[in-house]
């Protein structure tokens, strides 16, 4: 029995015509978009096409859960509704707001991106892949997400969840490039925003990593796996193997330091104690050095300060 979903790339193997495959793709997209139109989650960044708002949401959503991002996103845009507004503030102000989201390097990158957007792009978020990926911290995934969700351009946005879903649809393990090629090929050219948001919600709510709800899937007719046999998503495109434990990690220690600095300067001699690394001074020194290199903290007269005084 042939797979329920094939791509033009796979047609080279199966011998099916491109017209047959295009028919299947259009039927799949109709089913997905009809489902998405009725069931999409109500998330604040889905109510706007403002490129700056979309960029902020995508940076915040990197490795951070939706429920933690939502209040920070709303507060961020209330304070800094444009790149120009953020450039009038300080990195330390942004880092204070960022508390609770984790991975503060993203805040530094967003701060630097705002300055580049103002200085190089006249205050307008770029609308090409080539220009977007020149922004600090913006890679191909984030750039594609901005192009789709702000400018409604026909790109596929491949993240961990979507990579898992596409592998199951096609019934095969996918490398990163092939996964992205398939996402770009399958995207509905007339409704790229709705199609990609539908994929996100389908993958996040039904096509789960464990215990997928195959019987409730609105497009199960086109799925090659449907929960039977080995999961083709294992080790496939964009499918993560999970983060290292947070407890006892460098991330936790760095977070303690940055949280303390939101309340004011800290004597450098107290850094190890604040990070709960009194027994590992070498590690504490390395982490402080890393934070300085990333311009997240400044050392001045034997005191640590939040942000970069040279910003």
PLM feature spans:
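Short amphipathic alpha-helical interaction segments
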Residues: 278-292
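N-terminal amphipathic/basic-hydrophobic helices that include classical n-h-c signal peptides
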Residues: 1-12
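N-terminal export signals and maturation junctions of secreted/periplasmic proteins
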Residues: 13-23
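Residues in the recognition helix of alpha-helical DNA-binding motifs
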Residues: 146, 287-290, 305-307
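A short, conserved structural fragment
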Residues: 292-304
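Catalytic cores of DNA base-excision repair glycosylases
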Residues: 22-24, 30-252, 260, 265-267, ...
